[in-house]
């Protein structure tokens, strides 16, 4: 079923993130998280003749939202949809003959569509197959991880990607339960892990559990790293990077690249002790959703927007 863009995903920090791009005439812009098309639609509304927008999304469901954007003929000519993981940003820009870009926007995390889809296993609210793939054409599933990973590897991803303090005990219980069952649905997982979560924190901890599996399934941190490094190379001097994150792992990586120019956050200095970084921070403090937006869209509560501008070569 084709959904409207608004139903698919309500764009978070829409005005703030688009203003952060500082869009100008004849610019080339990239939205690496098309989703419901909300951010892309707003960018297109500000583009003029000679400008172009490339929008990425690896999910076939997202591509259907193009028809709901109501684009004019001029906007269609200025728009290219790329059905691909954004980790391949550099390759696709080379394919389209784009040497430099003037701005890149990323609204990271999972769209409302994925959380609310009762068939793909992204949420513990529904009984569904343990899939969690953004790209349904390839890759391992959450069920594969739960059934095949050894205890140590499983514990590591729960700790690193879910920040679960009981990761070792939970992993041990998951592996032990394999003797009685094969993990196929979300309920198969929940019956194993529920005893480890206090009722007061049950929903938060379950969300962290599902987050850890989703990140591993989709190689999200590796993809984000590759995209940010590519963006650093592709942005021309004065170009803007506008990124919305939803959890601490994403935010730390984005913060590091903007402040130091590398994923590790290692500060480099020149001969005179001056800090060398390719970016100038546009906002020193993260931008968060207003109280009004949080009331209208509860999923915006954890959103953090960071904006940086590529420096001129010195």
Question: Which residues make up each language-model segment?
Answer:
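S-adenosyl-L-methionine-dependent methyltransferase catalytic core, i.e., the SAM/SAH-binding region
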Residues: 1-314
């Amino acid at each position: 079923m084709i959904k409207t863009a608004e139903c698919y995903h309500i764009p978070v920090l829409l005005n703030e993130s688009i203003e952060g791009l500082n869009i100008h005439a004849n610019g080339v812009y990239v939205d690496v998280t098309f989703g419901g098309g909300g951010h892309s639609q707003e960018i297109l509304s500000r583009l003029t003749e000679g400008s172009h927008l490339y929008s990425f999304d690896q999910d076939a469901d997202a591509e259907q939202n193009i028809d709901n954007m109501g684009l004019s003929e001029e906007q269609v000519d200025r728009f290219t949809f790329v059905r691909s993981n954004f980790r391949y940003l550099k390759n696709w820009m080379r394919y389209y003959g784009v040497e430099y870009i003037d701005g890149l926007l990323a609204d990271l995390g999972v769209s409302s569509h994925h959380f609310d889809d009762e068939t793909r296993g992204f949420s513990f609210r529904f009984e569904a197959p343990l899939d969690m793939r953004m790209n349904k054409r390839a890759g391992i599933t959450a069920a594969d991880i739960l059934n095949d990973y050894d205890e140590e590897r499983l514990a590591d991803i729960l700790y690193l990607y879910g920040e679960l303090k009981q990761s070792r005990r939970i992993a041990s219980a998951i592996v032990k339960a394999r003797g009685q069952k094969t993990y196929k649905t979300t309920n198969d997982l929940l019956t194993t892990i529920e005893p480890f979560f206090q009722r007061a924190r049950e929903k938060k901890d379950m969300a962290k559990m599902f987050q850890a599996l989703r990140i591993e399934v989709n190689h999200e941190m590796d993809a984000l790293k590759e995209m940010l490094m590519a963006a650093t190379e592709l942005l021309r001097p004065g170009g803007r990077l506008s990124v919305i994150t939803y959890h601490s792992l994403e935010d730390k990586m984005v913060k590091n690249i903007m402040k130091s120019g590398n994923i590790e956050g290692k500060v480099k200095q020149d001969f005179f002790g001056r800090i060398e970084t390719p970016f100038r921070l546009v906002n020193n403090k993260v931008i968060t959703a207003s109280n009004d937006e949080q009331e209208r869209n509860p999923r915006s509560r954890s959103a953090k927007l960071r904006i940086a501008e590529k420096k001129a070569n010195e």
